[in-house]
Amino acid sequence: MNKKVIAIVVGVVVVLVAILGVVAWFVPILKVGNIEVTGATRTDPDQVLEVSGIVEGENLFRVDATAAGQNIVELPWVKSVTVNRALPSTITVELTEREPAVFIKRADGDHVIDTEGKEIIIGTPPVGTVEVSGADEGNSEVLPAVIAVINAIKAQDAQMTESIQVVEAPDQFDILLKMNDGREIYWGSSENNHDKAVAMSTVLKREGQRWNISSPSMVTVR
């Protein structure tokens, strides 16, 4: 087969592919028959479908995945989303949800904050979310400091956060953990959080009602 014939064959193939592409775009040969939502733990999948704007039966190739993703990521629990086509008839929607860390009671309800310090919802806090009390609304540094503490505790042992009843934090330098069993652990400032989390895991195994781990190398009890 000489070069001229090869060129003709390639040209024909290119034209056919282009024609098929145009036909697939304007004629709904492949339709959306199924929309799969994964990663929706706290987000209602039906709500995801509704805001996505994608409907079953529409042309698969004309689905605006970018616009759908932009709409979905506006839902409160959604941190990020990926929308893809899966031939012959499926749209996949993969969610990554925000992880709640703390909540704080305000006049308009409980404000649930994620591990990055962003407010998720005003409503019922999920199980395992730690309450923060005493924080000055005008001090923007308190909640990030407390969240850094909670993240360090989770990294050391996630079960330890479940034993915290409330965190009292009038400011970012004066953090006190009140435990479900009545014990108190004074954390102090949001510094050396890893070392303090290690110290916390140790003191929780010992007797004593009031522990001070603000200096993790010199833990005291009274």
Swiss-Prot record:
GO BP of this protein: cell septum assembly; FtsZ-dependent cytokinesis
Residues covered by the POTRA domain: 30-98
Membrane-traversing stretches: 6-26
Subcellular location: Cell membrane
GO CC annotations on file: cell division site; plasma membrane
Cytoplasmic topology ranges: 1-5
Protein name from the UniProt record: Cell division protein FtsQ
Species: Corynebacterium glutamicum (strain ATCC 13032 / DSM 20300 / JCM 1318 / BCRC 11384 / CCUG 27702 / LMG 3730 / NBRC 12168 / NCIMB 10025 / NRRL B-2784 / 534)
Taxonomic path: Bacteria, Bacillati, Actinomycetota, Actinomycetes, Mycobacteriales
